[in-house]
């Protein structure tokens, strides 16, 4: 029985992972589940899957969860806090760790899993964006297995040679596809009027609010560009982004002989999740098979960097190197949260991120401490920028 820990069990990736596990109860057992504050949802999953351990964000949430599980007669051990997250991620009793905590909060536990030599199913792109070299060194030094779960990187992983998943001779470039989000054809002059609800209404994917906004700005694709650099060793000039509104082609690898290999499928995160769980086998993910006769035309176009300045900022951060990607991510997290709370306009997100990236010192990312310090300084700078934003709050 393969034992799994799910970091971020109440988010969209966590819930999709549990759905796949539910379909294969004969081969997977849940060892630990974590959530920050969604105690009711976590309790329901603990009652169903009976994990040995559960972790929440605060002592208050832990007390609430313990009470709910006690009433249900479930003896899951409950703990809270960052140290507890790192503990379950590196627990000797778990085989695979689904790293699905959104944002910088997922960095430490995901790194702990790598350092413990786990099979890491990486859905938390920020771990690589912030600490790419540190993270990849940990994977190599401790014998961890790293399997990308983002649909784009999972697609590239599948399209690279089976005996060498790194970016090697013979590969001309990797191509990340992007839906373009809900504003792909909207007049850029009207983007300042976008509301949080509009930004979260993705045309193809069901996702959490933060990643939905990142998709709308294309910062999500920018972060994926940085992630692809570290996963596959691809320099910025060998990473291309194409808008593909149908979200059927999840990404491609172009080879020097003119061949292009692509991975296709219906837009459902259970496909890459099932791939990561069972690799190198294939299992039923509960996803309807792709019918190309119904899919119709598949369109591709270059991204408009006037409409999507966040994508250009991400390429800038990748080329700058060092802690610049961590600065980019931190500033974006602060700006997106402010937008979701109605404090700034949609177009202020890129403006704030650009200002912070321009002003921040771009030191080397030599240690986790350097990365986390850059993260905190960038957040402080972004919050200062919020005070300077003169646009009225979105309502």
UniProtKB/Swiss-Prot annotation:
Keywords linked to the UniProt accession: Isoprene biosynthesis, Manganese, Metal-binding, NADP, Oxidoreductase
Superkingdom as given in the UniProt entry: Bacteria
Any Pfam family: DXP_redisom_C
Disulphide-bridged cysteine pairs: none
Sites where the protein binds NADPH: 10-13, 37-38, 124, 126, 208
Entries under SUPFAM superfamilies matching the protein: 1-deoxy-D-xylulose-5-phosphate reductoisomerase, C-terminal domain, Glyceraldehyde-3-phosphate dehydrogenase-like, C-terminal domain, NAD(P)-binding Rossmann-fold domains
Enzyme class: oxidoreductase
Cofactor(s) this protein requires: Mg(2+); Mn(2+)
EC id: 1.1.1.267
Residues holding 1-deoxy-D-xylulose 5-phosphate: 125, 151-152, 179, 202, 215, 220-221, 224
Functional pathway: Isoprenoid biosynthesis; isopentenyl diphosphate biosynthesis via DXP pathway; isopentenyl diphosphate from 1-deoxy-D-xylulose 5-phosphate: step 1/6
Keyword Membrane included in the entry's annotation: no
Residues the record lists as binding Mn(2+): 150, 152, 224
InterPro entries: DXP_reductoisomerase, DXP_reductoisomerase_C, DXP_reductoisomerase_N, DXPR_C, DXPR_C_sf, NAD(P)-bd_dom_sf
Reactions catalysed according to its record: 2-C-methyl-D-erythritol 4-phosphate + NADP(+) = 1-deoxy-D-xylulose 5-phosphate + NADPH + H(+)
GO BP annotation list: isopentenyl diphosphate biosynthetic process, methylerythritol 4-phosphate pathway involved in terpenoid biosynthetic process
GO molecular function: 1-deoxy-D-xylulose-5-phosphate reductoisomerase activity; manganese ion binding; NADPH binding
UniProt record similarity statement: Belongs to the DXR family.
HAMAP family tied to this protein: DXP_reductoisom (MF_00183)
Stated role: Catalyzes the NADPH-dependent rearrangement and reduction of 1-deoxy-D-xylulose-5-phosphate (DXP) to 2-C-methyl-D-erythritol 4-phosphate (MEP).
Protein name per the record: 1-deoxy-D-xylulose 5-phosphate reductoisomerase
Organism listed in the record: Cupriavidus pinatubonensis (strain JMP 134 / LMG 1197) (Cupriavidus necator (strain JMP 134))
